[in-house]
Amino acid sequence: MTSEVIEDEKQFYSKAKTYWKQIPPTVDGMLGGYGHISNIDLNSSRKFLQRFLREGPNKTGTSCALDCGAGIGRITKRLLLPLFRVVDMVDVTEDFLAKAKTYLGEEGKRVRNYFCCGLQDFSPEPSSYDVIWIQWVIGHLTDQHLAEFLRRCRRGLRPNGIIVIKDNMAQEGVILDDVDSSVCRDLEVVRRIIRSAGLSLLAEERQENLPDEIYHVYSFALR
């Protein structure tokens, strides 16, 4: 549990905010120097997501998606804008959202809202989103704040909408990264938080073809 590794919650959040302020607004910056894995990541995410957009009567709509911890819009640009009519972005770092407006190019016109906010304080508009995409950011929330955020996301879904979490998974327990002020949880801890938020797990998949030295990365589809 994060309560065992985070001593000062306020400092946990403020330190992360300070860390991201000094990161360059580039794809490499967003991926901690692993910009070269972006295509592998996005191609797998597309396949994972499209199975829900193609299903029969319960298929997920393609009107509107929300990109959480969006940064400069790496996922918005390459995954969400090609599949959804409009996209909203939320990120804690103002400079990243400012950069997104040029990085996204012409298609960026279809980004409806740029919300500058930490996810612990963010509430998606109820019944608004077909897909809420949460990638490489859950480690910046405490267990309690993550469960509460997921509950708010559940209320933000349209009929047949889904939440996707894609993130690093620890081998065991919860590991604190003091550099960027984040935690990495093991699979069972994440599944437990998902259940506590009243969500069902529709699919779970491990990302393949990533460098050996980084954490295992898993995707979860939830409703």
Swiss-Prot record:
Cited SUPFAM superfamilies: S-adenosyl-L-methionine-dependent methyltransferases
Compartments, as annotated in UniProt: Nucleus
GO MF, one annotated term: N-terminal protein N-methyltransferase activity
Residues that, per the record, bind S-adenosyl-L-methionine: G69, R74, D91, V92, T93, L119, Q120, Q135
EC number, UniProt record: 2.1.1.244
GO BP annotations, alphabetical order: chromosome segregation; N-terminal peptidyl-glycine methylation; N-terminal peptidyl-proline dimethylation; N-terminal peptidyl-serine dimethylation; N-terminal peptidyl-serine trimethylation; spindle organization
Record flagged with keyword Transferase: yes
Annotated function: Distributive alpha-N-methyltransferase that methylates the N-terminus of target proteins containing the N-terminal motif [Ala/Gly/Pro/Ser]-Pro-Lys when the initiator Met is cleaved. Specifically catalyzes mono-, di- or tri-methylation of the exposed alpha-amino group of the Ala, Gly or Ser residue in the [Ala/Gly/Ser]-Pro-Lys motif and mono- or di-methylation of Pro in the Pro-Pro-Lys motif. Some of the substrates may be primed by NTMT2-mediated monomethylation. Catalyzes the trimethylation of the N-terminal Gly in CENPA (after removal of Met-1).
PANTHER family cross-referenced by the UniProt entry: AD-003 - RELATED (PTHR12753), N-TERMINAL XAA-PRO-LYS N-METHYLTRANSFERASE 1 (PTHR12753:SF1)
The protein, known as: N-terminal Xaa-Pro-Lys N-methyltransferase 1
